[in-house]
């Protein structure tokens, strides 16, 4: 179960629904742990939770923008407007290529900052594509699968490759929940 301070990564975050739900859950845990019954937190603390815990990767720029916007809207949901206006030094977090990476999960140059202990939770719904000779736009996945010697990816299914690679980013006690084809 998700606990305060845990790190969550969605390697194919799309519009960010899994990340938004994880962020909401972490905020609710913080509210419960502090006995806060107002349903509101200081914007700086909300920013800290977001930057400490939430990570995502998505190839589509528009989807990355939706993810970042949704996370900021979630932050705003837990702030009273006067508190936000009173804090002149507060700045919204820069998420692009800091916590939300607009890149291919299989790109060897992906700059995803994996915590030293690994991620605590990896959740997502990777694409259910089977690589065939005519499949276009999957050069990084194709190369990663071809170079994979430890674990064979059944039928060149990209979702299975996501599961293998994501599993390697988990910490010793980490858990993954990915929607995969049967």
List PLM regions with ranges.
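Conserved S-adenosyl-L-methionine
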Residues: 1-108, 180-182
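SAM-dependent methyltransferase catalytic-core segment centered on the flexible catalytic loop
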Residues: 17-40, 105-182
């Amino acid at each position: 179960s998700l606990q305060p301070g845990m790190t969550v990564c969605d390697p194919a975050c799309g519009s960010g629904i899994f990340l938004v739900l994880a962020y909401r859950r972490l905020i609710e845990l913080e509210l419960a742990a502090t006995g806060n019954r107002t349903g509101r937190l200081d914007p700086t603390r909300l920013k800290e939770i977001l930057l400490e815990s939430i990570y995502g990767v998505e190839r589509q720029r528009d989807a990355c923008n939706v993810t970042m916007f949704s996370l900021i809207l979630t932050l705003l949901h837990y702030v009273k407007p006067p508190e936000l206006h009173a804090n002149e030094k507060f700045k919204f977090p820069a998420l692009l290529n800091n916590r939300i990476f607009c890149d291919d999960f299989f790109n060897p140059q992906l700059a995803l900052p994996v915590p030293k202990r690994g991620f605590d939770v990896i959740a997502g719904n990777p694409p259910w594509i089977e690589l065939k000779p005519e499949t276009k736009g999957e050069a990084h996945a194709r190369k990663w699968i071809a170079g994979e010697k430890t674990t064979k990816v059944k039928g060149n299914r990209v979702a299975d490759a996501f599961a293998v690679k994501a599993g390697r980013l988990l910490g010793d006690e980490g858990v993954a929940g990915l929607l995969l084809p049967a």
